[in-house]
């Protein structure tokens, strides 16, 4: 397969590579060496926040979004070249506001969010003012098959009543996390691939609880996951 360059690849890729080599890599080892307790590893790190400021100053922000109204207007093919470069380091994607779960959540809000939802959640995510989480995996079922989800949402007197537990929920432990996109069953009588919905749940909603931080990779993962009950 032949991988041809494009004008946008030629413009952005050298800038991304320079940012990584000149700014990110020199501080990465120092950040990784810091003995941060596992339950504190989602908290904002001052050196990473400095990287974000530099990335914005260099025009390297929200590069993942193909919609030019919000991002750089790159195709998936063009962005893949930048993502490959970002993959050299733990922190480059976060520094450029291109890290999961925020990227996928922003894409959902761009495609399907109402104007009100975009104003409330998408804009602050694009600005790096808040973080988000995505709730899919559940303790009791093989969650790689989304049709197994057991969490439910039922409309009662005009309000959604949501019951369920998610774990390995990336992002939920970050104190800046203000919204979770929560996958749940809303139409249990439908065909099994048409039973589910994604519901936006503000993290300060009564009944939402981050139960515990999940441990993985001998406690060395720089980004632990969480067990969330709704």
Question: Residue spans of the language-model regions?
Answer:
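Single conserved hydrophobic/aromatic residue that forms the stacking wall/gate
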Residues: 219-230
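A short core secondary-structure module
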Residues: 159, 163-209
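A short, Trp-centered hydrophobic/proline-enriched beta-strand micro-motif
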Residues: 129-136
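A structural signal for short hydrophobic beta-strand segments in well-ordered beta-sheet cores
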Residues: 151-154
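Amphipathic, small/basic residue-rich leader segments at the start of a protein or domain
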Residues: 1-99, 116-120, 124-127
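N-terminal glycine-rich flavin-associated loop
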Residues: 96-116, 145
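Flexible, small-/acidic-enriched active-site or ligand-binding loops
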Residues: 206-221
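Active-site-adjacent elements of ketosynthase-type condensing enzymes
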Residues: 140-149
